[in-house]
């Protein structure tokens, strides 16, 4: 969520940013926010003036009564009653206008970084850099599920009976490999100075709306029936939520956390779930990292964070590349984002294994994550997140040979 004062003073810039994200249907929201914000401030000003007048006039009643001026006192009482009546009308009206402003502001996308390429969807994402030489075999490589089945390491049929498509049982050595990958990623990030964290796997609705857009929420989140709780789609949401409604000492920043968690996702949208694999599924495990820092440090942390993921995969001898996400592929709260993609020898192409994002102060503004500087002034922190590794997406078989296939 952008700053209301910024929108009020720069409506054309906000509209231009909406156009860059190919969300022209949201353009009317800017004028609507300005209109309702004006009404809210006018209602607030009128209410403040009336309260001051009420206090002033009310003091006259006792004095008039003491002077025996009953009729004048009654007239003043009637005036106070009229003021009170108007205040009862204004207070809900002011809240209605403020709620409408907040509702619209939650839908307006964050201002993207000038370096973000302009494009409508992920087909316009731009390759930044490659790391490692991709293996291009001249023989057919089995599907990853087939490889796991050879080791009795996966049971999709049983999972389908128990939970439906998009779930799996990992068994034996494959399950151990999965756990080992998670432990390796955990220790890798601890070695980078991050604090290990196991967060809650459910979060309340005010945290959900604080960390993501309504579109993301609808496409991803599972709600617990009858409860104000959602299963997390990624642990970054729970970790960022840790700082909700806090005022943090500037000297203690940055906060750097890494966490393991199961992740639960509807996977609604163009991609959907993968019928016979472990790539796009409803439940998986992931090691994640987040940073809460000063605004002037977020660009530097962004560069560090995606490089950590690249370093992790290169330590496993997996070729990777980074893609700069274009404007239309950025979620609404993101200022800048890049995908890390790993090479698949079987598919002979790269596929996404992680995503690094700088959200500026959007999440902090929604969740009221503030920082107190040395001068005593308060400001909103910047937040970033990045995938360390999602083990189901980590290549199980990266150095194939004709004999193995």
Enumerate the language-model features and the residues they cover:
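Short, solvent-exposed loop/turn elements at beta->coil junctions and helix N-caps
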Residues: 204-205, 324-331, 356-358
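Active-site loop/lid in soluble adenylation, ligation, and acyl-transfer enzymes
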Residues: 110, 114-125, 131, 138-270
